[in-house]
A protein has these predicted regions:
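Non-heme Fe(II)/2-oxoglutarate
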Residues: 60-152
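Structured loops at beta-to-helix junctions and adjacent beta-edge loops in soluble globular domains
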Residues: 47, 74-81, 89, 93, ...
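Alpha-helical protein-protein interaction scaffolds
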Residues: 1-54
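Charged, low-complexity, helix/coiled-coil-prone segments
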Residues: 25-37, 62-83, 166, 173-176
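Terminal transmembrane helix and immediately flanking juxtamembrane interfaces
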Residues: 56-58
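Catalytic core of non-heme Fe(II) oxygenases with the double-stranded beta-helix
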Residues: 124-134, 138-220
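Sequence-level detector for tyrosine residue identity
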Residues: 19, 28, 39, 72, ...
Length: 220
């Protein structure tokens, strides 16, 4: 019984169960009643965004009701005149880092993933990459600083990066997921397969969750 657990994850799973049962009024009631309790619960924030998009009715959860409007793109070209050489140097350093094939309890399928935070005692090129990410975080905030959602209004003053690297092989992919312990998530593609106009290797952003889904949910 999810209600008896009373923790960050169980409250979201209870909402997903209510959605499966079609109890929409109860969903809104719970999200609104717990809006102050869950103001930084990204599991609930993600579900709230989902239900708002489907039902076209806002909740009192103000973390970020329209997350697809906060997608931000950049390019290493804007940080390095010779970005190709920089990428190759980063890749060479990443090759020295231990990885596991399809690690358990992770979202990597048919691929390798590193086992620890790359930005803890980083090598030179990875440290340079870390500096680029920090500058991009500042650019991200500058772009959205006038928005009233909690994602921006409660923007952390201290930057603490956690990262890992993934190498996907043939037919490899990342299953749908969020990073509930991170204020903001991102990905840097260092090497990609040719697109062939079929979106091979492309990331998809959606409001659907691991255990809740609607065919008309917006995606990018």
């Amino acid at each position: 019984d999810f209600d008896s657990c009373k923790n960050l994850i169980s409250r979201t799973r209870a909402l997903a169960s209510l959605y499966a049962l079609g109890r929409i009024d109860e969903i809104y009631k719970r999200i609104n009643e717990d809006s102050k309790l869950d103001y930084e619960n990204l599991h609930v924030a993600a579900f709230s965004s989902f239900i708002v998009a489907i039902k076209k009715k806002n909740t009192l959860n103000k973390f970020c009701n329209e997350p697809l409007n906060f997608i931000y793109f950049s390019n290493l070209l804007s940080h390095h005149d010779d970005s190709g050489s920089f990428i190759n140097e980063v890749v060479d350093e990443l090759k020295k880092i231990k990885t596991n094939w399809e690690p358990s309890n992770k979202t990597t399928h048919k691929g390798f993933q590193s086992t620890f935070n790359l930005f803890k005692n980083p090598s030179q090129k990875i440290s340079n990459l870390q500096s680029i990410i920090i500058r991009e975080l500042d650019s991200y905030y500058s772009k959205f600083k006038n928005d009233s959602c909690s994602l921006i209004k409660r923007w952390p003053l201290k930057k603490n990066l956690e990262g890992w690297h993934v190498v996907l092989k043939q037919q490899g992919f990342q299953s749908a997921h969020i990073h509930p312990k991170g204020w903001l998530s991102g990905v840097i593609y260092l090497k990609v397969v040719p697109s062939l106009n079929k979106n091979e290797g492309a990331i998809e952003f959606s409001l659907n969750g691991f255990n809740y889904f609607h065919i008309n949910t917006p995606k990018k």
